């Protein structure tokens, strides 16, 4: 049946990841901080992380974008991260890998008598892949929609649609904006990211705010200051400004998530923004 549900996900929207829990031979440096590193060389299209879990214990892992010919994430972790001096004589306590969606949520998560939640609905955070929180709330919202449908004797797509609306306003809008930022980051080379950070085009607070789902707000004064710093690579600055605008557009679209009769028009607008980002060059 035509339930307007996306049944396939592109490889570019999936991360293949591998992580280990490791006991270190020395104390963790700055245990109150987590480390996330975006590097096309070390983790193509993804990032690697080091999360302290105790004085001598860390969760260390790496994810790569599942484009054609993508490298083995375990091999990349050992080559790019575990070869560092801080992991000398460390021991593996636990290890494992898997696949994580790294895109905005499924555009429609309901059909006649069915609701999609969690990984099945592409609900993990598009930037870092964490999905426990969003999935738990989605489960509650889906259950509430199902209960209302059972009480009314109507489990049609239209009856369950409230789950879409509530989830998209609560989290989908944030994730949609993050998806735009994720596409931008995956297009950046290591040199471009380093250049942007060194010259203030991408600042630490920009990355933090964006990873938390906030807009990249550029005031007129800030725009002017960044413009002059970006004279060396004006196309990179234009791409950053386009990304900020499209993040805001996507969040606005998802906050105005439609009823079924307006869904096709809304979806075309979403896909147009995503296509613009995917075709962007700099």
What are these regions (language model features)?
Residues 13-28, 76-92, 104-111, 215-217, ...:
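Charged, low-complexity, helix/coiled-coil-prone segments
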Residues 147-282:
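C-terminal helical "tail/cap" subdomain of flavin- and related membrane-associated enzymes
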Residues 31-41, 64-67, 82-86, 94-102, ...:
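A general structural signal for short secondary-structure boundary/capping elements
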Residues 28-37, 73-77, 109-122, 174-188, ...:
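Short, Lys/Arg-enriched charge-dense amphipathic segments
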Residues 26, 38-42, 103-104, 113-114, ...:
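Solvent-exposed, flexible loop/coil residues
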Residues 1-89, 121-123:
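Predominantly flavin-linked oxidoreductase catalytic cores and closely associated redox partners
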């Amino acid at each position: 049946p035509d339930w307007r549900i996306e049944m396939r996900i592109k490889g570019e929207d999936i991360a293949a990841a591998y992580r280990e829990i490791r006991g270190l031979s020395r104390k963790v440096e700055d245990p109150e901080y987590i480390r996330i590193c975006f590097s096309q060389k070390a983790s193509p299209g993804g990032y690697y992380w080091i999360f302290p879990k105790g004085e001598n214990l860390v969760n260390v892992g790496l994810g790569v974008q599942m484009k054609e010919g993508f490298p083995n994430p375990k091999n990349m972790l050992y080559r790019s991260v575990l070869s560092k001096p801080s992991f000398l004589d460390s021991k593996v306590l636990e290890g494992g890998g898997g696949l994580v969606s790294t895109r905005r949520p499924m555009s429609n998560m309901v059909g006649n008598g069915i609701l999609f939640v969690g990984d099945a609905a592409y609900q993990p955070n598009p930037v870092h892949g964490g999905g426990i929180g969003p999935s738990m709330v989605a489960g509650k919202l889906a259950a509430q929609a199902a209960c209302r449908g059972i009480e009314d004797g109507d489990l049609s797509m239209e009856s369950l649609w409230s789950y879409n609306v509530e989830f998209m306003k609560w989290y989908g809008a944030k994730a949609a904006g993050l998806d735009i930022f994720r596409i931008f980051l995956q297009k950046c080379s290591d040199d471009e990211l380093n250049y942007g950070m060194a010259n203030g085009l991408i600042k630490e607070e920009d990355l933090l705010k964006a990873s938390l789902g906030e807009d990249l707000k550029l005031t007129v004064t800030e725009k002017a200051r960044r413009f002059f710093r970006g004279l060396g690579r004006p196309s990179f600055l234009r791409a950053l400004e386009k990304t900020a605008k499209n993040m805001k557009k996507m969040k606005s679209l998802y906050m105005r998530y439609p009823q079924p009769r307006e869904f096709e028009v809304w979806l075309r607008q979403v896909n147009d923004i995503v296509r613009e980002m995917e075709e962007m060059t700099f």
